[in-house]
Amino acid sequence: MQRIEAMTLADAVFPRIQTDSRYLAWARDAALMLGFAGFVAVCAQIAVRLPWTTVPVTGQTFAVLVTGGALGMWRGAGSLSIYMLMGMIGIPVLAPGAPDVTGTWGLHFILPWNGTNAFPWDISSGGYVVGFILAAALVGYLAERQWDRKPWVHLGMFMGNALLYVPGILWLAYLIGTDWVPAGASKPLGEYISGSGTWNKALEGGLYPFIVGDLMKLFLASLTLPAAWGLVARFKGKQPPDVTPQTPAD
């Protein structure tokens, strides 16, 4: 049986065989996507509540970047889509809400499980949940081109991290501009965030508080994937595979 050359870390750890049936390959990919969706859910429960924003700092960003890098573009995006759908159908996989991280400052570390569930358009952090899908797709696309084992892996992680902020900040700005009142709150979202003007508040509540933490998380993700490739190479006794397409010999 001949193995198909690895394109991503997941393919190197769980290699496909050329004799695998289509259904076996689908089952393998589905299991990987579900498993990494669970990984993101666990990391979402590592949450820090800041007093000046309704969006918590969580371990999700790290998990999203690693998921994209490990699975590749389509499976990475699929895994984060599953994660979003799990929250939409009532499974508490999203980050803890404000009532679960009490006080002006708060920390929650996985247990007891205080995850939430919601449609993305019902929560202030919904734009970021959508952004996770885009970020995983971009990082996965780059990983399929070996960026996850190159010196510029940090750049790819930064690009993915930056991309997830686009829908996140846009959605937050929309909610602030429409005087949206969060569930269980007594005043509009914008009044919980310092600053003046819709866009200034959106940046104050949805970007500035997370810059340092996200730089740390993307740096950690940048170390995790090359290290994982190194372990694979060590246990399999070879270098991380070069996935440059080869033309079959006649």
Put a short name on every predicted segment:
Residues A30-L34, F62-V66, A77-S81, S125-V130, ...:
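Hydrophobic alpha-helical transmembrane segments
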Residues R3-A10, A95-F109, T178-W199:
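Peri-membrane helix termini and adjoining interfacial loops of integral membrane proteins
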Residues T53-T54, A143-D242:
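Membrane-embedded alpha-helical hairpins and interfacial helices in multi-pass inner-membrane proteins
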Residues Q2-R22, R28, V40-V42, P99-I169, ...:
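Short helix-perturbing small/polar motifs within transmembrane alpha-helices
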Residues Q60-F62, L71, R75-G76, P96-G97, ...:
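Pore-lining transmembrane helices
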Residues A37-Q45, G69, M73, L80, ...:
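Transmembrane alpha-helical segments of multi-pass membrane transport proteins and ion-pumping complexes
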Residues Q2-S81, L85, I89:
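Hydrophobic transmembrane alpha-helices
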Residues M1-R3, G237-D250:
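Short, charged juxtamembrane terminal tails flanking transmembrane helices
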